[in-house]
């Protein structure tokens, strides 16, 4: 189950939105759809399009395994998803 954003943790909603925005920008630059980002290059679905949408819009906090998957699909180091945030 995806981790919901906790508004009681100072800065968490803003941080989650920034990470989601960064992933969306990289996804669009790469020319991938949300469904393609959530799947492997061979089409095996790891993360549903709805999860990707919720993550990109800051409604859910991505797990470490989700971040690792997205970084791999976007051909960027995992640290690039968080750099400067």
What are these regions (language model features)?
Residues 2-29:
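A short, Lys/Arg-rich alpha-helix, primarily the initiator
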Residues 18-21, 31-32, 47, 62-65:
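Residue-level signal for the short linker/turn that defines the boundary of a DNA-recognition helix
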Residues 23, 34, 38, 67:
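Generic structural marker for isolated residues within well-ordered, non-membrane alpha-helices
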Residues 30-54:
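Short alpha-helical DNA-recognition segment
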Residues 41, 56, 66, 82:
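DNA major-groove recognition helix of helix-turn-helix
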Residues 63-80:
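DNA major-groove recognition helix of helix-turn-helix/homeodomain DNA-binding modules
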């Amino acid at each position: 189950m995806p981790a919901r954003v906790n508004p009681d943790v100072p800065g968490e909603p803003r941080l989650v939105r920034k990470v989601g925005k960064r992933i969306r920008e990289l996804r669009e630059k790469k020319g991938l759809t949300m469904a393609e980002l959530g799947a492997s290059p061979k089409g095996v679905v790891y993360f549903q399009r709805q999860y990707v949408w919720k993550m990109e819009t800051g409604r859910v906090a991505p797990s470490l395994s989700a971040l690792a998957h997205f970084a791999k699909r976007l051909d960027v180091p995992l640290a690039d998803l968080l750099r400067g945030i």
